[in-house]
Amino acid sequence: MFKTINKSITSILLLLISFYQKWFSPFFGPRCRFIPSCSSYGYEAITRHGPWKGGWLTLKRLSRCHPLTPCGCDPVPD
């Protein structure tokens, strides 16, 4: 049952990220300070690590994405 819940949450989160990438991101233009972009990072983190750890990694990344943080390459950890 826990695996089913994890898969459902993963699917919902990935759907939300895909929706953002397709419908909202083109209007805002490139704003992320990192490579890969925050939405791509979130998609990869959730795909690799599942909804809980991947979601946490994504939230940490989003909290670092602001003008006071140095930009650069920030890949998803293994």
From Swiss-Prot:
Record's keyword annotation contains Membrane: yes
GO cellular component: a single term: plasma membrane
Signal peptide: none
Disulfide bonds: none
Subcellular compartments: Cell inner membrane
Alphabetical list of NCBIfam families matching this protein: membrane protein insertion efficiency factor YidD (TIGR00278)
Protein name: Putative membrane protein insertion efficiency factor
Species, as recorded: Prochlorococcus marinus (strain MIT 9301)
